[in-house]
UniProtKB/Swiss-Prot annotation:
Entry comment describing in which tissues the protein is expressed: Highly expressed in the cuticle and midgut. Low expression in the head and thorax.
PROSITE patterns for the chain: DDC_GAD_HDC_YDC
EC number assigned by the record: 4.1.1.107
Protein family: Belongs to the group II decarboxylase family.
Organism whose genome encodes this protein: Aedes aegypti (Yellowfever mosquito)
One GO-annotated biological process of the protein: cuticle development
Keywords: Catecholamine metabolism, Cuticle, Lyase, Pyridoxal phosphate
N6-(pyridoxal phosphate)lysine: residues carrying this PTM: K306
Cited function: Involved in cuticle development. Probably responsible for the protein cross-linking during the development of flexible cuticles.
UniProt cross-references to SUPFAM superfamilies, sorted A to Z: PLP-dependent transferases
Record protein name field: 3,4-dihydroxyphenylacetaldehyde synthase
Length: 521
């Protein structure tokens, strides 16, 4: 096969599995961020493809020398930045098997098990998450689920489906308008706390996306949506879709579906719910309050690769009425047709997505869920939440800090006083590369996000992270071992300038940071 025979394949494959196993077991020994500069790889790899191939041992050696040093270690328990991109040993096996099978399952006939396993897995996941039954593929409803690549992809698809449904309806309601005129008046809504993918979906879908202001708790309320819709209707626009978020990117806030849902349903406004991260918590009865009002949504998405131990990419998406997406996306060429199409238990998923070809993602989902079981999944999610609560206790016990919000496995906090404190602290932590956090804003203030992530986070990892935060805070504020402030720098407020750093712009004086509890001399 190509330039590798079966024996070499087995040897290379075993070496690769051994590397991954050792890498994950010993990942705590590595700095979570790489020590490379932009363009480092251009100096290491040739500019052109080699004329003759190398043996796998040479390639594996170069992989270790050239590729691994450029990694940010997302599976490290010291990765506390973005929402996690988790994996598990069972998922890795499933991904490997799917790659070896090489299935392209855009229709049932292309590989029946690829389609049927996906239908079953989407019901398994929906039942695990205690979703309203109207979203499941069952005899008494029109619902159904599909695996997409990412939340971004799912949101974009929801916007496109809502757009096409609205255009069909509006052409009947407004025969005096051309289709082009109707499309030019479409408008969509989301919170200013939603993921950037929502705003991007408006750009790609050629729909004006209004970012509505959330309240002081970063929650979008029904009255805010109502006001915006009424303003737009008065200006001759046509509201199409509201994209709500359960678990915002910055602070994991939850839009109020109990207020938003009824208004959307009463005003022919498609309601899509992005629960990319927080959706995993639906499997826990104690967090059922998060999804109140979800039954009023027309579609929703949840990333298994964030918190259900399936590796990237794998996003579950459900529709209350699956016919809506097939009506919007169906393009049926003769070479794609087969005699079994149209069966509810064997959908042609090519009609449920943007691209034609699709991967056998349901295989890694099945292997992961069957290996772990629902009980173990719930246990691990609860454990991750307890780790975040442990970190929160550390923060609250230190009077220099304040917790701005804490929910699920995310803690948002800051140093009291001016934003300059927290900005410089985060800058110093990122430069050291021992743990990795990113910033957000909350009520106009700069905050630090501490996220539980990695393949196997433990209590000692929380101790390690807190010690890093505390020690860097001590250095920043000039605190000795007894907790006394020994900072004697002369602070010059008049000579302020801004400089670039890994977390944005920070304000500094030439004499050092201007501390909020001290007056500049």
């Amino acid at each position: 096969m190509a330039n590798m025979d079966i024996d070499e394949f087995k040897e290379f494959g075993k070496a690769a599995i051994d590397f991954v196993a050792d890498y994950l077991v010993n990942i705590r020994d590595r700095d979570v961020l790489p020590s490379v500069e932009p363009g480092y790889l251009h100096d290491l790899l040739p500019n052109e493809i080699p004329e003759k191939g190398d043996d796998w041992k040479t390639i594996m050696e170069e992989f270790k020398r050239f590729i691994v040093p450029g990694l940010t270690h997302w599976q490290s328990p010291h990765f506390h930045a973005f929402y996690p991109s988790q994996t598990s040993y069972s998922s890795i096996v499933g991904e490997t098997l799917a790659a070896g099978l090489g299935v392209v399952g855009f229709s049932w006939i292309c590989s029946p098990v690829c389609t049927e396993l996906e239908v079953i897995m989407m019901n398994w996941i929906g039942q695990l998450l205690n979703l309203p039954r109207c979203f499941l593929n069952c005899d008494e409803g029109n619902g159904g689920g599909v695996i997409q690549g990412s939340a971004s992809e799912s949101i974009f698809i929801a916007v496109l489906v809502a757009r096409e449904q609205a255009v069909r309806r509006l052409k009947n309601e407004h025969p005096e308008l051309t289709e082009a005129e109707i499309r030019g008046r479409l408008v969509a809504y989301t919170s200013d706390q939603s993921n950037s993918a929502v705003e991007k979906s408006g750009i790609l879908g050629a729909i004006k996306m209004r970012l509505l202001p959330a309240d002081d708790d970063c929650v979008l309320r029904g009255r805010t949506l109502k006001k915006a819709v009424e303003e737009d209707k008065a200006n001759g626009l046509f509201p199409v879709i509201m994209v709500a978020t359960l678990g915002t990117t910055g602070t994991c806030a939850y839009d109020n579906l109990e207020e938003i849902g009824p208004y959307c349903n009463d005003n022919k406004l498609w309601l899509h719910v992005d629960a990319a991260y927080a959706g995993a918590s639906f499997c826990l009865p104690e967090y059922a309050w998060i999804k109140k009002g979800l039954e009023m949504a027309d579609s929703l998405n949840f990333n298994l690769h964030k918190w259900l131990f399936v590796n990237f990419d794998c996003c579950a998406m459900w529709f209350k009425d699956a016919a809506m997406i097939t009506e919007a996306f169906s393009v049926d060429r003769i070479y794609l047709q087969h005699k079994f199409q149209g069966m509810s238990k064997a959908p042609d998923y090519r009609h449920w997505q943007i691209q034609l070809g699709r991967r056998f993602r349901s295989l890694k989902v099945w292997i992961t869920l069957k290996t772990m079981g629902a009980e173990k999944i719930r246990e691990l999610i609860r454990f991750h939440i307890s780790l975040a609560q442990k970190f929160e206790q550390y923060v609250r016990a230190d009077p220099r800090f304040e917790v701005t919000s804490s929910t699920l496995a995310l803690v948002c906090f800051r140093l009291k006083g001016e934003d300059t404190y927290s900005k410089q602290l985060l800058d110093n932590i990122v430069k050291r590369k021992k743990i990795y956090m990113i910033p957000a804003t909350y009520q106009g203030k700069f905050i630090l996000r501490f996220m539980i992530a990695g393949i196997d986070p433990q209590a000692e990892d929380i101790d390690y992270a807190w010690n890093e935060v505390k020690s860097q805070t001590d250095l920043l504020l000039g605190v000795d071992d007894n907790g006394n402030n020994v900072c004697s720098k002369k602070l010059i407020k008049e000579e302020i300038f801004e400089k670039d750093n890994p977390v944005g712009k920070i304000t500094e004086s030439l004499g050092g940071l201007v501390l909020a509890n001290e007056k500049a001399q």
